[in-house]
Amino acid sequence: MADIKALVEELSKLTVLEAAELAKALEEEWGVSAAAAVAVAGPAGGGDAAAPAEEKDEFDVILTGDGGKKIQVIKEVRAITGLGLTEAKGLVEGAPKPIKEGVNKAEAEEIKGKIEAAGGTVELK
């Protein structure tokens, strides 16, 4: 164990150039490639691509635009979020921006309906 710690300390002292040279020398000595090790690992996750997606239970409500009715959308954003006029205006003008995050499906659909009724466009993620 002490040998490993000493080796780690010595390797930590190497410059980037020296570390690259070391990697190349080890690749040649052992007949391996660092890039090949990554390719062999394969994709992460390992889930079945054909498996049905689980239904989400939390959504982010993203304002994507004001639809030309900025004032009505700002009023609705203020009512939904409790933000002040300046903050709500900044949110609407800075779209796409999240209005609410981590809400249940029913609340997300309700918010979407209110914003769309005011003239805005919304995306649920």
Swiss-Prot record:
GO annotation terms (biological process): translation
SUPFAM superfamilies tied to this protein: ClpS-like, Ribosomal protein L7/12, oligomerisation (N-terminal) domain
Statement: the UniProt record of this protein carries the keyword Membrane: no
GO MF terms, alphabetically ordered: mRNA binding; structural constituent of ribosome
Domain of life: Bacteria
Family membership: Belongs to the bacterial ribosomal protein bL12 family.
HAMAP family attached to this UniProt entry: Ribosomal_bL12
Protein name: Large ribosomal subunit protein bL12
Gene of this entry: rplL
